[in-house]
């Protein structure tokens, strides 16, 4: 993964001050918010479909510092996508969520605005997230020229038993 520039590092540092890592307790619903920044690769499968992988890092409530991989398929004519968020916390616990998304152009050439709605998978998540449920919305910008993305997410997560 490419090194993040100072602007991205600064943005993550600001969010770190706002998004203190916590933990969920059985039966409690908690906010799930954070930010991410990373690199994007895409491979054309056919004229209408790209296979895209985001490899990023960030900080979030409930996760703390994390790495995330986001493999997904993009339907180019409709600008829609479907795939998975695979968060890995510093201790190795994993939070998995399926998502669908929509991309729209911005006023900046080569930069796309993306909104993705994700649902946490209680069966695929591990460690303290095993059995957890919830959902979140990711809003991010994708710079197709630089091959980078930066964004934030907000939602809720509940521990097993909720």
Segment roles from a protein language model:
Residues 22:
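An acidic-aromatic pocket/loop used at catalytic or ligand-binding sites
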Residues 25-162:
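Beta-strand-enriched cores of mature, soluble protein domains
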Residues 9-19:
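Bacterial N-terminal signal peptides
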Residues 1-5:
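Positively charged n-region of N-terminal signal peptides that target proteins for export
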């Amino acid at each position: 993964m490419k090194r993040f520039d100072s602007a991205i590092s600064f943005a993550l540092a600001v969010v770190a001050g706002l998004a203190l890592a916590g933990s969920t307790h059985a039966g409690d619903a908690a906010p799930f918010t954070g930010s991410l920044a990373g690199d994007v690769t895409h491979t054309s499968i056919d004229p209408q479909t790209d296979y895209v992988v985001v490899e990023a890092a960030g900080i979030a409530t409930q996760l703390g510092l994390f790495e995330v991989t986001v493999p997904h398929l993009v339907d180019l004519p409709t600008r829609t996508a479907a795939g998975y968020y695979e968060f890995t916390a510093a201790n190795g616990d994993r939070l998995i969520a399926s998502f669908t998304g929509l991309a729209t152009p911005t006023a900046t050439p080569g930069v796309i605005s993306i909104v993705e709605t994700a649902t946490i998978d209680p069966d695929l998540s591990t460690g303290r997230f095993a059995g957890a449920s919830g959902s979140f919305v990711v809003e991010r910008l994708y710079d197709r020229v630089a091959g980078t993305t930066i964004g934030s997410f907000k939602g809720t997560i509940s521990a097993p038993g909720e």
